[in-house]
Amino acid sequence: MQTLRIMDTTIRDGQQSLWATRMQVGDMLPILSKMDKVGYWAIESWGGATFDAPLRFLDENPWERLRAIKKHCPNTPLAMLLRGQNLVGYHHYSKEIVFRFVHAAHRNGIDVFRVFDALNDIRNIRDSAEAIKETGALFEGAICYTVSPVHTLDNYIEYAQGLKDYGADTIAIKDMAGMLTPYRTERMVKALREEIGLPVHVHCHYVGGMAPANYIKAAEAGAEIVDTASAPLAFGNSQPAVEMIVAALKESGYDTGIDLDLLFEIADYWDEVRERNHLKRGVSSLIHMQVYSHQVPGGMMSNLVSQLEQQNAGDRLDDVMKEIPKVRAEVGYPPLVTPMSQIVGTQAVLNVLSGKRWGVVPSEMKDYIAGYYGKAPGPLAPEVVTKVLGDMPALEPDVWPSELVTTTYDEVAAEAGDLAHSEEDVLMWALFPNEARTYLSKHRTSEKTEFMLEEEYLGTKEDETVDINQIKELIKVVEDTGIGEVTVEEAGVKVTVRAKGEVAYAIPAAAAATEAAPAAAAAAAAPSAAAAATAAPAAPDSARPANWIAVTSPMVGTYYSAPSPDAPDFVSIGDEVVAGQSLCIIEAMKLMNEVKAEQMSVVREVCLENAQPVEYGSLLFYLEPITS
């Protein structure tokens, strides 16, 4: 028997699974020093959706976030989730970008890289594995666990051997959908220990409730590490609560040795954050228990709910949950993990909301079916392949998708121009060019940091004062971490230290949080200054010829007139288009969804400006049919 080690997932997978990755770094920093004292094997703090979500929704720089976390956790290794050739994005990147990103992540604070490929295609692990071994960081190779007619224990062991051959230091079983059961866990852990011989790390989502029993069986079978979250961010779609697992193993041969009282202090803090921001606890409902049917992972579930609400279609969740297994079977049973969870989930949403199965297909789904994400685990439905690809050729089986991506760092740096002031800025642009452009333009500055001090008297006593040493400490936090603003309240006075010229995130004082929260929420929800007003749904129009066709948006999202910022528009007024020709892109649910002409026509009106938000049914174009 050996002590079971714990990796904490609260500030990465916990919040991604329950809070749609909307936790601000200011909510994290006050508690990190206590988390650093727990004795975790590692704190998972970065990667997954915690790179693009802060950039996209919170106006935060993910690199600054990582540096700030590292500053407050000097004693505990920081871990990240890396999507192999996809890094923290949603498609393949070139070998050079992969190597530079891994080195930058390590340089900024990452000690443990958990690497997975959504298809368990070992080819998509090679570049990141080589880069990690160069840095000297720990390389944890992850198996995406799922249940399907084409996934077997032998497949998983063969894949684990491939990870070992690439230099993996540990093997993780990544049960992102909560599909593992106690006896499946026992068999898989034993097989990995006996046949691969590396330390085994088990990652389960609570979902249907079996995860704690899985962890007990995993420990008994020889697993060394499991993943948990602090109770306020545990259960439901997230991981089991650390307090539960630590208590369960007390006085056993697997006793973690972790102080429960310290864990409860940390949990009290996270519960305050949850209440202050009006966020939900993790719960297991009937739809969660049905995971053994729909196989939807925790993070995917919370995002699906959020996305359907954005589409004003929250009542269609049951329909989407029934559609997901159908789509998954038609495209070869990919494990539902990023980016495949987004690709399959979005296709299911589009099938349901449009009323036409496979009528609207995101470009990412088309690329997957063509083989550009890697090899599908099982056979694809021929009728779907024909409908989606048409005349587009599929990739030959012996071609490695990653070798087709040749974008260089210098090319990205040239595109970013003087908006990028560091390698990290360029890498951010390489992964998310539109979001990076918006963020870097807004925060453009090359001046030496100066500090501004704001003071607001809130007290009731005339003799209340603020300790000057505390102000010095606030300045030190801003200076050392790169965070733009820190606010605390003490002795009836609220003090804010702000880096001049920066618009960043604040650490809310507990007493001032209720007052500050609505403003913060409004700021997070507001569109960028450059964005136009959201286009309204189409209304009947008798001013145009009766034969003109109104093309409307099939979803809520952002309208893009061109495939990339520097490319020409798909169409212009007066252009003739044929059936199936792309008219524009609607970015929604992190995917690019092409809107196509349904018949030969002439473009008579373009109704929107580029990058304008749209609602479901918003007018995009008027087309005049061409009759022979």
Residue spans of the language-model regions?
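Catalytic cores of alpha/beta
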Residues: 154-159, 208-221
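Structured functional modules or segments
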Residues: 521-628
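Active-site mouth loops of central-metabolism enzymes
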Residues: 10-30, 81-97, 116-119, 142-155, ...
